[in-house]
């Protein structure tokens, strides 16, 4: 019998230094911290999903063929160029497992989505950071294209991850800059378009011409399916085939696959929801901009980054008024800042009132 195990000693060094991901949950608070779509599913969609003949006693279709065919119609990418995952987080880790590891490196542009670095650390992939540039006068973030290309020239670099629009800043980077990095880097370029439906911009149309381009998308944001964990990668069949070698079998459950197929039939309804959320976010941004002490950063997503004089106080007082937003800690180039996404219109009305009382 083992009385005591030295777990820290047995852990891989790259895991030993990591902190477990924690999501905050406060009862009776309006959740504006996770960039979700708060609007209900389109009428009839839930009934259609629950009425589907799903064999819960059987393993799901390991190839998610019906879903990939629906995604092919939606994106214009052939089904053999599509890989589905248990949320984008699984796909990010799959990318690091396949093309990273202890002899590989990835280039990222902080501040950006934290899971890129987390997945890299778990897999022992080296992380090279090329921070964004900040134009203080316009409060716009920019890619350091030359810096990214210089970092990517190092032989151990296999991947570059570009988040567009970027989380947490909301920045939409110019298409020509992204395509220049794809063309000149000679490395795998992953463009995370989780919020692409809100910006209306995409580089998916360039996949036929760029064998090193992967575009990652999700059903968690506009399609309001965060609870079902469904993401997908788009690329040329050769690179998707390589990733399939390391993919876990049956990684997307039958219920989520069917939900994705059905959701894609409601494109017009979801597009209207996107317009509503963007208009609501603009209303919140306008209210924040009225306060000279608050920096509001430009956004092309369904969330915004802002910086009051005392972020910690604003965060805590909003909780006291029934609103949970995201405290971003000390962001590179920015310092302490807060991020919020939109609630329902009536919730946003209350939020604007609460912000006015706190910031006055």
Swiss-Prot record:
Family: Belongs to the class-II pyridoxal-phosphate-dependent aminotransferase family. Histidinol-phosphate aminotransferase subfamily.
Keywords noted in UniProt: Amino-acid biosynthesis, Aminotransferase, Histidine biosynthesis, Pyridoxal phosphate, Transferase
Cofactor(s) essential for the protein: pyridoxal 5'-phosphate
GO molecular function: histidinol-phosphate transaminase activity; pyridoxal phosphate binding
UniProt pathway annotation: Amino-acid biosynthesis; L-histidine biosynthesis; L-histidine from 5-phospho-alpha-D-ribose 1-diphosphate: step 7/9
Source organism superkingdom: Bacteria
Organism: Desulfitobacterium hafniense (strain DSM 10664 / DCB-2)
InterPro entries: Aminotransferase_I/II_large (IPR004839), HisP_aminotrans (IPR005861), HistidinolP_aminotransfase (IPR050106), PyrdxlP-dep_Trfase (IPR015424), PyrdxlP-dep_Trfase_major (IPR015421), PyrdxlP-dep_Trfase_small (IPR015422)
A single GO BP: L-histidine biosynthetic process
SUPFAM superfamilies associated with the record: PLP-dependent transferases
Name of the protein in question: Histidinol-phosphate aminotransferase
Catalysed reactions listed for this entry: L-histidinol phosphate + 2-oxoglutarate = 3-(imidazol-4-yl)-2-oxopropyl phosphate + L-glutamate
N6-(pyridoxal phosphate)lysine modification, residue list: 221
EC id: 2.6.1.9
NCBIfam families named among the record's database cross-references: hisC (TIGR01141)
Subunit architecture: Homodimer.
């Amino acid at each position: 019998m083992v009385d005591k195990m030295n777990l820290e000693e047995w852990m891989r060094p790259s895991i030993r230094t990591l902190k477990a991901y924690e999501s905050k949950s406060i009862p009776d608070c309006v959740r504006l911290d996770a960039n979700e779509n708060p609007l209900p599913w389109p009428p009839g969609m839930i009934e259609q999903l629950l009425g589907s003949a799903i064999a819960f006693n059987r393993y799901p279709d390991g190839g998610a063929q019906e879903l990939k065919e629906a995604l092919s119609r939606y994106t214009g990418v052939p089904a053999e160029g599509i890989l589905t995952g248990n949320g984008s987080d699984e796909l990010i880790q799959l990318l690091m497992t396949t093309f990273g590891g202890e002899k590989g490196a990835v280039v990222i542009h902080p501040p950006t989505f934290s899971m890129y670095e987390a997945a890299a650390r778990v897999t022992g992939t080296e992380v090279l950071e090329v921070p964004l540039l900040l134009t203080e006068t316009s409060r716009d973030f920019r890619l350091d294209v030359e810096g990214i290309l210089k970092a990517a020239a190092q032989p151990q670099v296999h991947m570059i991850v570009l988040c567009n629009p970027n989380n947490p800043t909301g920045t939409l980077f110019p298409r020509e800059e992204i395509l220049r990095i794809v063309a000149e880097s000679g490395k795998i370029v992953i463009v995370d378009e989780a919020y692409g439906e809100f910006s209306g911009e995409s580089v998916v149309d360039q996949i036929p011409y760029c064998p090193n381009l992967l575009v990652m998308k999700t059903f968690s944001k506009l399609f309001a399916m965060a609870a079902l964990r469904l993401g997908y990668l788009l690329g040329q069949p050769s690179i998707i085939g390589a990733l399939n070698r390391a993919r876990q079998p049956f990684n997307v459950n039958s219920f989520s696959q069917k939900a994705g197929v059905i959701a894609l039939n409601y494109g017009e309804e979801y597009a209207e929801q996107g317009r509503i959320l963007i208009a609501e976010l603009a209303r919140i941004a306008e209210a924040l901009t009225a306060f000279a002490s608050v920096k509001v950063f430009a956004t092309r997503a369904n969330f915004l980054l802002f910086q009051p004089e005392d972020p910690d106080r604003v965060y805590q007082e909003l909780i006291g008024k029934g609103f949970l937003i995201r405290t971003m800690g000390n962001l590179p180039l920015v310092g302490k800042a807060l991020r919020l996404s939109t609630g329902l219109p009536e919730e946003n009305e209350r939020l604007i009132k609460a912000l006015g009382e706190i910031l006055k």
